[in-house]
Amino acid sequence: MFQNATDWTPTSTDPRDEQFGGVVEPVPTPSDADDYDAVLVGEPYDGAVIGRRGARDGPSAIRESLAGVKTHHFDAGAVSGVADLGDVVLPDGDVADTQAAVREAAAEVHETAALPVFVGGDNSLSYANVAPLVAADNGAVGVVSVDAHLDCRAVGDRGPTSGTPYRQLFDAGLDALAVVGARHFETTTTYAGFLRDQGGRIVTSDAVAADRDGSLDAAREALDGVDHVYVSVDIDVLDAAYPGASAPTPGGIQPRELFALVEALAASDDRIRGFELVETAPTLDTGGRTVDAAARTIAHFLAGAQ
């Protein structure tokens, strides 16, 4: 079910430069992650992406970048207690087969004592990562999706895509969704109306830029009644200056805003049950800037969660 992770190696030769490459430890099975605070899981798949492909290379590139990031956070201290379960072994087949395999793997990861950190891969796998929490019937589940798009498209003849995960999750029983960083002119009236009909909250990228803390409060308010919270980041929430994504467009948020959002969510809410970062496409990037932003987003989330 999992292809074991390779050993992590720091990029610095100075032993005082404690980096994630010297802290993250590979583990062979989900049960071995119980001794850690968080566990990384790679999902190298982009067969369902609507736009440009390349996200299948995201997990390996993000790991490589994260290995060279120092673990010290000025407020939270040094990040530690992180395992790496490796990549989910994906089947040959259609998107539905892939979602089923990832869902089975994600269910095992959610049963561990460690906080799951899924590294994609395309946005279609958000359904597979969250569905086990919904199916557990152990309380209401809500998602904070930090994304330029709503991803509430109906599943059509093509089957599931990177644009359908939250429609699939609502159909499965998801209780609440807040989309933070959504961009004007990136969705349709139909899908915006669908999300609002479900009681969802849309917080635009303009709102994040004008009042980051207020935007975070709006997202929390939308999830006020749930018992479990899952946080999803689609890297295309960043401005098009960070081009290593399937669908970069102008008007996105800045990395500093993204880092602060995920760190605050992780630090202030004990209902967090998982995190994912999706749609990073290294082959579409310029100078590794998007990959580096993705790696540091994970670092900030881990700092907030500890």
From Swiss-Prot:
Annotated cofactor note: Binds 2 manganese ions per subunit.
Catalytic activity, as annotated: N-formimidoyl-L-glutamate + H2O = formamide + L-glutamate
Record: residues binding Mn(2+) 1: N123, D147, D151, D234
Gene3D superfamilies: Ureohydrolase domain
Binding-site list for Mn(2+) 2: D147, H149, D234, D236
Domain of life: Archaea
Name this polypeptide is given: Formimidoylglutamase
EC number: 3.5.3.8
Enzyme class at the top of the EC tree: hydrolase
Alphabetical list of SUPFAM superfamilies matching this protein: Arginase/deacetylase
A biological process term (GO) from this entry: putrescine biosynthetic process from arginine, via agmatine
UniProt-listed PANTHER family: ARGINASE/AGMATINASE, GUANIDINO ACID HYDROLASE, MITOCHONDRIAL
Cofactor: Mn(2+)
Alphabetic keyword roster: Histidine metabolism, Hydrolase, Manganese, Metal-binding
Pathway annotation: Amino-acid degradation; L-histidine degradation into L-glutamate; L-glutamate from N-formimidoyl-L-glutamate (hydrolase route): step 1/1
Gene responsible for this protein: hutG
Matches recorded under Pfam families: Arginase
